[in-house]
Amino acid sequence: MPLLDRNGWKAEAFDIVALEDLDAALAAKAPEQKLGVLVPNNIHPRALAPVQDRLDLIAVEFPRHSDGRGFSLGRMLRQQGFGGTLRASGHILPDQFGFALHDGFDEVEIDEAQAARQPVEQWLHARALISESYQRTEDGPATIFQRRRAAR
């Protein structure tokens, strides 16, 4: 499935396993192997805390574009200290791309049909449209309220 980050399309660089296969994959992991896990959007981030430092990627499933739990999970994983690549996988819309990046995701994975319908330029344009934030974000820009307070 196509992958997209803030710069455009990119190639897959990870071996990704299902959550139920994670223990076996970690036990068999080669030193140079980049290992990731695909998790549902309703998992509690603490369930990944014991192994997150051994993972290079966590891919969070987005089963429907109207289900925003994955955004919250991504933010909580970053707050918990996960420093690897964070991927939103599944039903993401271009309009949600900027929000995913603000919540700590590094990349999104969409299906081939969506990639054909919505070219990379549409995704990058949608990302650029979100220039202001009312809430603190994981990617650092000051919020509208922080800038207003600093200007006083």
PLM ranges: what are they?
Residues 85, 94-96, 108, 112-152:
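Alpha/beta catalytic cores of nucleotide-metabolism and tRNA/nucleoside-modifying enzymes
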Residues 25, 65-76, 116-128:
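Active-site-adjacent beta->alpha loops and helix N-cap segments on the catalytic face
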